[in-house]
């Protein structure tokens, strides 16, 4: 079976790699030959698939922020479309990455209509959408959706899409996570030392808009807790020099960790994190967190006043139960002072900390059961 997979972002690369490994396992059980070509990143490349192009470095959120990546994205899109036209796969799998993947899906539906399109991890149109067109586009291009949230499955089923709920793949990843004690031993952190994970960057724009404010907050926390150790997992090697320079500028006691993100999360007493999949990882590890995010003022104004964009929450942890489990500091609220206030309260207030851990249990119950990637892989291989 020949499969083409398309995804973007650092998180999409991770989800894609986990799915590919599961596809290989399930194909071996069925004695099925498998050939996979993909758009993705380094993690997917490490699985041994043929990578047509790398997408994580050209990922962005926001309108103005996306401008520098329009041409690289367009070139990669053109390359993918040409490949699909010349080498139609048996199956096309799209993973999240709304704009580019919808464009690829539309092209495939029109030019190679015989190829089934499966969407794994749909864009969050079930939470937000600027208009009904986003949802309708997804319905039009998708033969079957493998949903990771139960509400996602209900939403798209109501719109007429063929859907199955497989659960969230983060459960499979976190099943391999070390305990707090194991992670601290591996990283050389004393059992009683305060450790804080800083997770502000997975996209280039966040080096400018998020990293400085998080480092300023970390500096203030360090002044109040002199023994604190900061742990910064590296999303992409390209970001190392900027992060290192920023840590030096603010005199932060910490370590940049390459390839040890789960160790950093598991070892932490608290995390200061951008909104994204990492919020769910922290919840599953019972690590309290402060979620922060910033866009350019112009992007925010356009989104609110022209596109009429609104969303109840930013973090998937809060979206899963539709209430604030973790504090979200967005835009003008994402100040060093606010971050410090929320962080110290979560660290030093036992009642607040226990409430967070209790709420995490409710989030966990909404994510399904371990074995997500294998269930998804079985459905994919049985589809054709």
From Swiss-Prot:
One of its GO terms (cellular component) is membrane. GO terms for molecular function: lipid-A-disaccharide synthase activity; phospholipid binding. Signal peptide: none annotated. GO terms for biological process: lipid A biosynthetic process. It catalyses: a lipid X + a UDP-2-N,3-O-bis[(3R)-3-hydroxyacyl]-alpha-D-glucosamine = a lipid A disaccharide + UDP + H(+). Belongs to the LpxB family. NCBIfam families: lpxB (TIGR00215). Condensation of UDP-2,3-diacylglucosamine and 2,3-diacylglucosamine-1-phosphate to form lipid A disaccharide, a precursor of lipid A, a phosphorylated glycolipid that anchors the lipopolysaccharide to the outer membrane of the cell. This is Lipid-A-disaccharide synthase. The lineage of its organism: Bacteria, Bacillati, Cyanobacteriota, Cyanophyceae, Oscillatoriophycideae. The gene is lpxB.
